[in-house]
């Protein structure tokens, strides 16, 4: 009997593994024709590096991007472009293949022209900032590698081009993208950008009345140097050239094969340093290059483990469902390319933006362009990139996002004290990577007596609560994976303290009492996202405060002597307000508000992300009524960009609507790479479009409430699926739905199986 049991377990394990491998290979992106331009590029990356890879007119191109490469204006600069040319050219014939090999995390390109055949492997070392290009051919070729830069001279940016930086529509004088330093050195091409002493940080500090604190404020742009070197063992310097790609002039620095060869290996090592001396940066770069080994095995293992950790593979008769499953995996690949980034993955393009005129023909700017800035962090967008990482078990990948806020904590507290004289960290929605409001959104044309802590902005005024979603994510990593979150407790506590201190401060300015007649904070003025403005007791803020406070109080990391303080604050948070449509009770966006300014539905934030309403919880009918009858919610409904309607539908168990909206969101993008969605409200590839799609698919498949785990709460019975997702309390759930029946369920630890509720036939 024991032998039979062992055989069955072994067989099941092998069967699971083989089906995962097959499903993953099926999701590989394969092109058999070359691309027309960079918009038809393929993402490749690893660690904190992203490449756009494409072959155009027989030449191989790569854009180089890396996390944290911010210039003086807070543009997230690319690190240049590589162009590979070959003689004789195997890519001048009719036989061609380019493939993204998801399982191992790299791309291959093969071509044949007459008798000559060649294959190129492009991969990034997950653990070192090094790009490898392996070129193999059946006959000797001469390879030319051209490092191309559009930053060979200073470039004045005007008009909409400044949307790529922190000045946006309100530049203060002439704004320039400063040139890079590029030269042949040490047998290769060395390139770097060194930030000048004066940056947008200094301009913003002065604008917001914080000059006296300038030397104590955290400044990530100061002394920043970033770049790299391109080398090849059989490559020598071969002079310069110049040209124009699309509308952007460039200059090139060429390396060429010393002698024709059947194999070449190009190495591009990158380095980012905070140092005032270029020599220090060069020393670090040299060390990185010396330790760069052409050994892909560790990176392959990382990608293999990444895919085995979590997946959703759909096999349905509905092609839209199949596309959703595939694009879920493709987008997760893009997220994995910034697993160890110094900065979080940007919602507006991540590491994979391309020439802007291919998105909007009027924007004939450089490849550095992205709408909504480089160093500007827009919290309502960013959150959608990071929430799905809980159910995929990618807790390590959430660290850059958490550390982003932790690094800015001191600045946010200084800002609060300077403006209002009380405690707490005030984080705004449009937040710079140094913790102050974006200067354009803050407003240059302000009444003389307008408070320095406030943004003079109809969309953003009084929107303080977006940081609380990141506080909740931190707390959830502890609940999901027993992560040690002690270092983040000051961030969570200071963010909560701001609300207590600030709304007592405002109440005392209006009158003698700090609280209302029921002993609650008066959350006025507030904001329901960017939509319901000058709100009194905004529902999104109330839901956020209640949920974060409850989670903090329950956290084992919170010192016992702190629990009474936060329990007392929880008692001061007012209740959610309601209103009626067609005699149906619905959740109101606030108790009162003055105007509607945008197209969000924060009245449903108690459903997601805050989970106050949902399957198996009191008031589900009220939340469903809000989704179905609230005229604003109906008017704002969409699947585009950051819209969350698919997530709301899934959380409410509305299978048909969840499937419709999620497949619309996750269907092929219309671009050559299926997961390059956008621009939506932001930019292409739109990462908050992909993130909200991921969340929706996950919530359709599995939800949790305390210890309970609901399977298929909004999943169509005819969508066959093999999945593996994470639940709270260090739990993984893997299984298959086949012909409407759950088979092969695997729950770890096994003790959690009793908490599973299969809803496929009960809804």
Predicted features, each with a name:
Residues 325-326, 376-381, 393, 461-469, ...:
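Aromatic- and histidine-enriched alpha-helix N-cap/loop-to-helix transition segments
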Residues 113-119, 125-130, 139, 151, ...:
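A conserved hydrophobic secondary-structure block that centers on an alpha-helix together
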Residues 312, 333-338, 384-396, 469-482, ...:
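Well-ordered alpha-helical scaffold segments within catalytic/enzyme domains
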Residues 1-24:
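Bacterial Sec-dependent N-terminal signal peptides
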């Amino acid at each position: 009997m024991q032998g039979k049991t062992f055989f069955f377990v072994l067989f099941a394990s092998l069967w699971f593994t083989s089906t995962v491998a097959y499903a993953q290979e099926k999701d590989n992106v394969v092109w058999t024709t070359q691309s027309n331009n960079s918009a038809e590029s393929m993402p490749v990356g690893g660690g904190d590096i992203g490449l756009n890879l494409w072959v155009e007119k027989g030449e191989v191109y790569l854009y180089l991007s890396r996390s944290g490469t911010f210039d003086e204006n807070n543009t997230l600069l690319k690190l240049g472009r590589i162009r590979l040319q070959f003689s004789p050219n195997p890519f001048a014939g009719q036989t061609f293949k380019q493939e993204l090999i998801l399982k191992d995390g790299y791309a291959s390109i093969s071509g044949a022209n007459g008798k000559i055949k060649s294959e190129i492997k492009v991969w990034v070392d997950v653990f070192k900032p090094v790009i490898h290009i392996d070129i193999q051919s059946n006959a000797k070729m001469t390879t030319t590698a051209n490092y191309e830069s559009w930053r060979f001279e200073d470039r004045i940016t005007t008009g909409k081009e400044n949307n790529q930086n922190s000045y946006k529509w309100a530049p203060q004088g002439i704004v320039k993208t400063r040139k890079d330093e590029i030269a042949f050195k040490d047998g290769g091409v060395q390139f770097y950008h060194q930030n000048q002493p004066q940056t947008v940080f200094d301009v913003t500090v002065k604008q917001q009345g914080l000059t006296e604190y300038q030397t104590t404020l955290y400044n990530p742009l100061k002394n920043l140097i970033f770049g790299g070197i391109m080398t090849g063992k059989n490559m020598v310097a071969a002079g310069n050239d110049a040209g124009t790609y699309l509308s952007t002039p460039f200059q090139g620095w060429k390396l060429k094969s010393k002698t024709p060869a059947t194999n070449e290996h190009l190495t591009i090592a990158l380095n980012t340093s905070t140092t005032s001396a270029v020599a220090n940066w060069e020393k670090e770069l040299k060390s990185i290059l010396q330790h760069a080994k052409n050994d892909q095995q560790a990176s392959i293992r990382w990608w293999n483990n990444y895919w085995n950790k979590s997946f959703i593979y759909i096999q349905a008769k509905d092609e839209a469902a199949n596309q959703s499953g595939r694009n879920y995996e493709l987008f997760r690949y893009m997220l994995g390319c910034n697993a160890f980034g110094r900065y979080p993955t940007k919602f507006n393009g991540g590491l994979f933006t391309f020439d802007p005129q291919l998105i909007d023909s009027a924007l004939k700017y450089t490849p550095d362009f992205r709408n909504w800035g480089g160093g500007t962090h827009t919290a309502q967008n960013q959150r959608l990139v990071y929430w799905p990482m809980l159910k995929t078990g990618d807790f390590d990948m959430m660290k850059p996002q958490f550390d982003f806020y932790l690094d800015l904590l001191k600045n946010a507290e200084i800002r609060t004290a300077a403006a209002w004289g009380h405690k707490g960290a005030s984080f705004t929605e449009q937040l710079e990577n140094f913790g102050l409001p974006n200067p354009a959104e803050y407003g240059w044309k302000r009444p003389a007596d307008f408070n320095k802590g406030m943004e003079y902005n109809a969309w953003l005024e009084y929107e303080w609560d977006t940081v609380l979603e990141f506080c909740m994510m931190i707390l959830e990593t502890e609940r999901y994976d027993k992560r040690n979150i002690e270092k983040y407790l000051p961030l969570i506590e200071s963010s909560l303290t701001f609300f207590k201190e600030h709304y007592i401060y405002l109440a005392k300015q209006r009158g003698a009492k700090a609280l209302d007649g029921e002993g609650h904070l008066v959350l006025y003025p507030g904001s329901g996202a960017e939509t319901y403005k000058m709100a009194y007791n905004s529902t999104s803020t109330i839901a956020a405060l209640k949920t974060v406070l409850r989670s903090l109080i329950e956290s084992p990391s919170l010192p016992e002597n702190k629990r009474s303080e936060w329990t007392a604050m929880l008692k001061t948070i007012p209740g959610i307000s309601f209103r009626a449509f067609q005699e149906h009770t619905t959740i109101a966006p606030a108790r009162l508000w003055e105007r509607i300014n945008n197209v969000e539905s924060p009245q449903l934030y108690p459903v997601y992300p805050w989970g106050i309403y949902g399957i198996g919880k009191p008031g589900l009918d009220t939340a469903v009524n809000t989704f179905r009858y609230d005229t604003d919610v109906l008017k704002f409904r969409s699947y585009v960009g950051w819209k969350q309607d698919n997530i709301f539908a899934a959380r409410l168990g509305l299978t048909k609507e969840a499937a419709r909206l999620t497949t619309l969101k996750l269907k092929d993008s219309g671009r050559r790479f299926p997961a390059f969605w956008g621009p939506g409200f932001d930019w292409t590839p739109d990462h908050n479009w992909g993130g909200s799609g991921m969340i929706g698919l996950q919530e359709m498949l599995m939800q949790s409430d305390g210890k309970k785990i609901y399977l298929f709460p909004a999943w169509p019975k005819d969508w066959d699926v093999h999945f593996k997702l994470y639940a709270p309390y260090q739990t993984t759930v893997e299984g298959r739905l086949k012909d409407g029946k759950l088979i092969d369920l695997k729950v770890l630890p096994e003790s959690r199986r009793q908490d599973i509720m299969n809803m496929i036939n009960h809804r």
